[in-house]
From Swiss-Prot:
<dbReference type="InterPro" id="IPR029057">
    <property type="entry name" value="PRTase-like"/>
</dbReference>
<dbReference type="Pfam" id="PF00156">
    <property type="entry name" value="Pribosyltran"/>
</dbReference>
<dbReference type="GO" id="GO:0005737">
    <property type="term" value="C:cytoplasm"/>
</dbReference>
<feature type="binding site">
    <location>
        <position position="27"/>
    </location>
    <ligand>
        <name>xanthine</name>
    </ligand>
</feature>
<keyword id="KW-0963">Cytoplasm</keyword>
<dbReference type="GO" id="GO:0032265">
    <property type="term" value="P:XMP salvage"/>
</dbReference>
<comment type="similarity">
    <text>Belongs to the purine/pyrimidine phosphoribosyltransferase family. Xpt subfamily.</text>
</comment>
<feature type="binding site">
    <location>
        <position position="156"/>
    </location>
    <ligand>
        <name>xanthine</name>
    </ligand>
</feature>
<dbReference type="GO" id="GO:0046110">
    <property type="term" value="P:xanthine metabolic process"/>
</dbReference>
<keyword id="KW-0328">Glycosyltransferase</keyword>
<dbReference type="GO" id="GO:0000310">
    <property type="term" value="F:xanthine phosphoribosyltransferase activity"/>
</dbReference>
<protein>
    <recommendedName>
        <fullName>Xanthine phosphoribosyltransferase</fullName>
        <ecNumber>2.4.2.22</ecNumber>
    </recommendedName>
</protein>
<dbReference type="InterPro" id="IPR010079">
    <property type="entry name" value="Xanthine_PRibTrfase"/>
</dbReference>
<keyword id="KW-0660">Purine salvage</keyword>
<comment type="pathway">
    <text>Purine metabolism; XMP biosynthesis via salvage pathway; XMP from xanthine: step 1/1.</text>
</comment>
<comment type="function">
    <text>Converts the preformed base xanthine, a product of nucleic acid breakdown, to xanthosine 5'-monophosphate (XMP), so it can be reused for RNA or DNA synthesis.</text>
</comment>
<feature type="binding site">
    <location>
        <position position="20"/>
    </location>
    <ligand>
        <name>xanthine</name>
    </ligand>
</feature>
Amino acid sequence: MKILEDRIRQDGTVLTGNVLKVDNFLNHQVDPQLMNELGQEFARRFQDAHITKILTVESSGIAPAVMAGLHLNVPVIFARKHKSLTLTDNLYTAKVYSYTKQVTNEISIDRRFLAADDRVLIIDDFLANGQAVQGLLDIAKTAQITVAGVGVVIEKRFQKGHQMVTDAGIQLEALASIASFEAGQVIFAQD
C-alpha cells in the first residue's frame, strides 16, 4: 500500500535490534485519516471472507482493527493484556511474548464475545515473530472458531511470523511488507 510505505519512509525510524519506530502515526500518536484508509484496504482485501468479528490485541492493533470493523460492519474484540475488576473469569487466555517490550503477557478475551459460528479476522499493527497472532490463533482454537484471515499493517518478512501464518494455510494480508533494514533504511518487499 503505497500511502503506508511512503509514510513509513517519511516518519518511521529504524532502531537497533530490527525495531521500526512508527509511534508518530500508529503506536502512540494515531493518524485517524491513515487508519481509515488502512481499514478500507483491509475491508477490500477480506470482503469475500464472510467475517463476523475482528480480533486484535491491545493497544496498537485497536485503531486499524476498529477502522476495518467499521468498513466490514462487524464488531471488534481486543484481547486485554491486564485483568481488571470487570474482566475476571470465564475467559479465553493465551500467553504472548512481546518482542519490543521483552515481556510475556497473558491476553484474555471474555468467552461471551465468541460463538462457534464466528469467522474472525485477526488484525494487528506488526507481524514480526508472530507471537501476538499466535496467541489469538490459540484463543480461536480453544473457542473452536474459524480464523478467516490475518491482516497486519506492517510485516517484517525477514522474521518468522509471515512463514508461521502462511504455513498454517491462513490468508495473510500485509499492507506494508518489509524485506530488510539496510543502513538505517527500510527496504520493502517487491511482491
